[in-house]
Design a protein with these regions (language model features):
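Extended, composition-driven regions rather than compact fold-specific motifs
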Residues: 1-259
Length: 259
């Protein structure tokens, strides 16, 4: 007698912890991409040993004092992190690519009005210095889920790009990519990825909720990634869980908050 068996499910994502290391890095190259991103390539000996196992990892970038140009870094002690009198301004960014042979780290900065990081990135030139810490931890998401859904806005495009590049060899997966745009020119950011068909959506919370509500939920061997503005991400996450999505196969992260 033959017994039918269901296909084995892809394992759940796993978390990896990394030692906390602060590094000073230097701009090697800076270019504008898709009209609204600055692609900065950093280098430096302190990048030796850098590791980023998760496609949506974040590193914390510390910016120089706007008046003095000085970088103020903490000390890492057995008791924890010790900051000096001046704690530098910082922002979180996704490591797009790291080349361990050349110790070069690529980070894409989304350019928007009146942003500390945006202002720095627009003016960045070879030789400029920054400091960074992390990633402190990674969520390692298998690439072989049969069905994968990704939803983000411009803030999540670097992580999405990194993921889509990694998925390119996997021809068997069913991929749904939804991107909410405040700036239409950002469409060009993924234009070179011929294996991906994106659905471009307006930056409207009600329309995003409606689109996700209309989306057919994938079978069990699936992964869903949702990022963007905090309240919108929570609303979509709650909706998906109410519809029966396994929370262990859903990654919902607020990348920014409406003020």
């Amino acid at each position: 007698m033959q017994h039918s068996t269901s296909p084995a499910l892809t394992p759940l994502p796993t978390r990896v912890r990394n030692p906390l290391v602060f590094r000073q890095i230097t701009v090697k190259q800076a270019d504008t991409v898709a009209g609204c991103f600055r692609r900065i390539v950093f280098h430096g000996d302190q990048l030796k040993g850098f590791s980023s196992a998760g496609f949506d990892d974040h590193i914390k970038i510390f910016f120089p004092d706007r008046e003095t140009g000085e970088l103020h870094l903490p000390q890492v002690t057995p008791e924890g992190i010790v900051w000096g009198d001046q704690r530098p301004a910082s922002r979180d960014y996704t490591p797009l690519h790291f080349d361990a042979t050349t110790n070069e780290l690529t980070v894409d900065f989304f350019i928007h009005a009146q942003g500390l990081a945006s202002d720095w990135a627009v003016a960045a030139k070879p030789g400029d210095g920054l400091a960074m810490g992390g990633p402190r931890g990674s969520l390692v998401v298998p690439e072989t889920y049969a069905h994968q859904i990704y939803l983000c806005d411009e803030s999540g495009l670097p992580a999405l790009r990194r993921r889509l590049l990694a998925l390119a060899p996997h021809q068997h997966i069913t991929l749904t990519v939804l991107v909410s745009l405040h700036r239409p020119e950002a469409k060009a950011y993924l234009a070179d990825l011929d294996h991906v068909q994106c659905e471009w959506l307006p930056a409207d919370a009600a329309q995003l909720n409606a689109r996700m509500a209309a989306l057919a939920l994938p079978p069990e061997d699936s992964f869903i990634w949702v990022t963007g503005e905090g309240e919108g991400v929570k609303a979509i996450s709650d909706q998906l869980i109410e519809r029966g999505v396994n929370p262990d196969r859903l990654r919902a992260v607020a990348y920014w908050h409406q003020k």
